[in-house]
Amino acid sequence: MEIDTRGSEKSLSFCCLKIDNKFCVSRLTREGTSGFLVAAGQYLKEKYLEDIFYNKEQKTHYDSTMFTGYDMDRTMLRIGAMNMMTHGIANPNIAYKDSLSEQNTDSGKYTKILANPPFKGSLNYEGVSTDLLKVAKTKKTELLFLILFLRMLKTGGRCASIVPDGVLFGSSNAHKAIRKEIVENNRLEAIISMPSGVFKPYAGVSTAVIIFTKTGAGGTDDVWFYDMQNDGYSLDDKRTAIVGSDIPDIVARFKSLGEEAKRERTEQSFLVPKAEIVANGYDLSINKYKKTVYVEETYPHPLEIMTEIRQLESEITSGLAELEAMLRE
């Protein structure tokens, strides 16, 4: 398994997702650069200890070539390398590289990509690899990275990337072109909507996890949507641990997608057929498809409310009169 991740601005490169139960997301935390890679390595160590660590060839692969990471901040690269080494990855394969430029020639190379690219950024066309612009001519980094991930994956490779909500419903030609590319020419599997605040205090934007497999020949059928409300931490700047995390439920449901067809659109997760997504202009925002049940509120008759108000006025008047009498004594 090979995994690529790229840091962003310093304020965002401290955010990552942990691995759990063959699913890309366990919980949000702040771990420093290479957090994705470290979490993936820890997961493999827990689940495939004998297969990897008792096999010399596989252990060498684990230590040197299994994981790949790029960043444009040398300080973050040093911290990332140190993080990986302290977690048992002896020779971290991370490098100083501008992932979106012609400098990055990786194509059809990786089986897994986990990424938390910059939420907002704009580049000059001259600084972007020309093959990325062929899919969609855009300067927005959050869009360019999705195109890059498709290029870097092997056929059959899988990507889980955090994206700002705007990527899912943006109306520009570039937004639509990228969503169409993923839905029509590859296999879109899941959209996991996350609450605003999961990246505080670094960023307060609403985000989601998009999961897709590179096929080059379509394959999207039903897309799974999940509305995460609780990631196990408060949504303020302190991000303190709280009970009721949705993460275990996400993992369990994702592993049993066959059961999700029974769920209604009013529930926390549900499936949406490809045809409906196409009909909605490839809009991938969960609010486009989730149905909200409005409970009709019943209120007292206006005359009852007026009677109650008069009673309160009477009590207030009586109280004021009593207070005035006490003050006159």
Question: Where do the PLM segments sit?
Answer:
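Conserved S-adenosyl-L-methionine
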Residues: 2-115, 120-122, 131, 139, ...
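A conserved structural/catalytic subdomain of Rossmann-like adenosyl-cofactor enzymes
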Residues: 101-329
